[in-house]
Amino acid sequence: MHFTIQREALLKPLQLVAGVVERRQTLPVLSNVLLVVQGQQLSLTGTDLEVELVGRVQLEEPAEPGEITVPARKLMDICKSLPNDALIDIKVDEQKLLVKAGRSRFTLSTLPANDFPTVEEGPGSLTCNLEQSKLRRLIERTSFAMAQQDVRYYLNGMLLEVSRNTLRAVSTDGHRLALCSMSAPIEQEDRHQVIVPRKGILELARLLTDPEGMVSIVLGQHHIRATTGEFTFTSKLVDGKFPDYERVLPKGGDKLVVGDRQALREAFSRTAILSNEKYRGIRLQLAAGQLKIQANNPEQEEAEEEISVDYEGSSLEIGFNVSYLLDVLGVMTTEQVRLILSDSNSSALLQEAGNDDSSYVVMPMRL
């Protein structure tokens, strides 16, 4: 194997592919990236046995075919440290990878390509083409609510639900829930649900960088595959039953608060400074036309904000984890937001004013 390539052409796919590779591995070959040269195409593959990412680069010069695996992070760090306009010469010589650029030379250890595992792919049962920017927005609006290392392993991921002409994403950690829907060219009559693991969702979002580009999604029995121009991403699915999110969405809340998103966000952020560092509780006191936000901590320090809101119902006092409210306001984009409440023991429903494609549920806190 022998090829030459510009630093820039190699670095972008290498960084994305190396992002999948875990630092601590049980199998040494999983710390490596698989390099394959065929014709005038170089492909780079990284995997952790759950998620696999393949990047493809066209080579400008004729190349000698071959395949080998090399330490992903070391190769990436070498590329990063070379000058921007460097031309990199890479070849395999006696089980070592020789990397040359200008007056720099590196010799890396290798492992045989045969040792490199591939993610098993069954047949796909459903295929659709989506705009990258729309799918990225769907993920960005919901991924913050995914659980991390929850024993309920099905919460450490995102539910993707396809039905006729609609793709919906839902995530929850048991304390809050995020839901977003987008229209999509899907010819599926009945609802089909899959759970994509947390790491898979975050890596997929990193791929969706082309505002004009499309991404092809294939859903199989045990895997999801996404293909863009230069990359193919495959992830195993989580085998589990996601909670019935429609039962979680509060119904019949009679107290509607409409407020300025940025003003609320700033007031919550300031109040949060003096909330309990562990529990992050703040108290909301609603009265006609105004919202009072209070926080205090074990050191007897207190913060209070008053903010004008559009509200005409009876007075109400309710507690929340301020981080959860800030996360929601952080992904919204409209000027005005709606907060729908019923009583101090019921969850709040947050939505953008004038936009129904996203809904957020936050459970209250006892203060």
Curated annotation (Swiss-Prot):
Places the protein is found: Cytoplasm
Superkingdom as given in the UniProt entry: Bacteria
Stored CDD domains: beta_clamp (cd00140)
This protein's UniProt keywords: Cytoplasm, DNA replication, DNA-binding, DNA-directed DNA polymerase, Nucleotidyltransferase, Transferase
GO cellular component, one term: cytoplasm
A Gene Ontology BP annotation from the UniProt entry: DNA strand elongation involved in DNA replication
Record-level Gene Ontology MF annotations: 3'-5' exonuclease activity; DNA binding; DNA-directed DNA polymerase activity
Gene3D superfamilies in the record: 3.70.10.10, DNA Polymerase III, subunit A, domain 2
Pfam families per UniProt: DNA_pol3_beta, DNA_pol3_beta_2, DNA_pol3_beta_3
Family: Belongs to the beta sliding clamp family.
Quaternary state and interactors: Forms a ring-shaped head-to-tail homodimer around DNA which binds and tethers DNA polymerases and other proteins to the DNA. The DNA replisome complex has a single clamp-loading complex (3 tau and 1 each of delta, delta', psi and chi subunits) which binds 3 Pol III cores (1 core on the leading strand and 2 on the lagging strand) each with a beta sliding clamp dimer. Additional proteins in the replisome are other copies of gamma, psi and chi, Ssb, DNA helicase and RNA primase.
Biological function: Confers DNA tethering and processivity to DNA polymerases and other proteins. Acts as a clamp, forming a ring around DNA (a reaction catalyzed by the clamp-loading complex) which diffuses in an ATP-independent manner freely and bidirectionally along dsDNA. Initially characterized for its ability to contact the catalytic subunit of DNA polymerase III (Pol III), a complex, multichain enzyme responsible for most of the replicative synthesis in bacteria; Pol III exhibits 3'-5' exonuclease proofreading activity.
Protein name: Beta sliding clamp
Source organism of the structure: Pseudomonas putida (strain ATCC 47054 / DSM 6125 / CFBP 8728 / NCIMB 11950 / KT2440)
